[in-house]
Amino acid sequence: MKKLLFILLAILLVGCQAKVVEDVDNSLNNIIEKGKMIVGFTEYPPMGFKENGEVTGFDIDIAKAVGEKLGVEIEFVYIDWDAKVLELEAGNIDMIWNGLTITEDRKKEILFSKPYFNNRIVVLTLKDSPINSISDLSDKNVGVELQSSGQSALEASEVFGSINEMVKYTTITEAVLDLKAGGIDAIVADEIFARYAVSKEADAYKIPEEVFNSENYGIGFRLEDVALRDKIDEIIDGLAEDGTALEISLKWFGEDLLLR
């Protein structure tokens, strides 16, 4: 009887030890050991995009600075935005870092960093368009990036039931091309992108004053990767303190927009 009890206790102890091993968060150590951090991004200027074959943008520059502090290489992998969570969970990327809005629904699938950027959802339309408010979207064809905050904001708005059609695009740049070609009447998107588009072609576009809502951007990690998330937050705080983040923000926006 005593021998049987000893065996049962031994099995229980081994099981508990295995559970402890399973619960150890090696997310940060794994990155350091392999010497590389894989960042998922999409075509979303000015946060992250390709220009002349090179990956660039505000988020890209901040990520590179984080990599230097951490002592690892940063690999940028282009992803379909509507498959971002699948890419993360499959281990194809270590994080989503490209104007990712923090929402309660996304928190169920994604572990977020501290907010690092504030943004609003606005309407982008052609300079000579009669659209000057959200209500003017009624009976219009409105473009959005698939699975974006712009899509969510439009669907949740009072005007949604009266628009002619919501046209979904894989990337926001595709929506802009269609807007310019006359395929749609307006786009609902992040203000930071809309202002970037206007800055590039001030004579082509305008942004009505009325906004849908305000939001914060965060970096998205796997739910269990707390150690990695905490370290990235710590490094970004340091970049804000030593002036590196300010320099990057001034480069892209002409002012300090980092929420740290």
Name each model feature, range by range.
Residues 12-15:
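C-terminal motif of bacterial Sec signal peptides marking the signal peptidase cleavage site
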Residues 17, 21-22, 60-69, 135-136, ...:
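Extended ligand-binding regions for polar small-molecule ligands
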Residues 20-99:
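Extracytoplasmic small-molecule ligand-binding "clamshell" domains
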Residues 25, 75-86, 129, 166-178, ...:
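Short helix-initiation/N-cap motifs at beta->coil->alpha
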Residues 49-50, 63-72, 150-169, 198-202:
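Ligand-binding cleft/hinge of the Venus flytrap
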Residues 64, 68, 73-136, 206:
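Acidic, polar ligand-binding/catalytic clefts
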Residues 83, 100-108, 152-157, 178-181, ...:
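A ligand-binding cleft/hinge motif common to bilobed small-molecule-binding domains
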Residues 117-125, 173, 191, 195-237, ...:
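Periplasmic-binding protein-like
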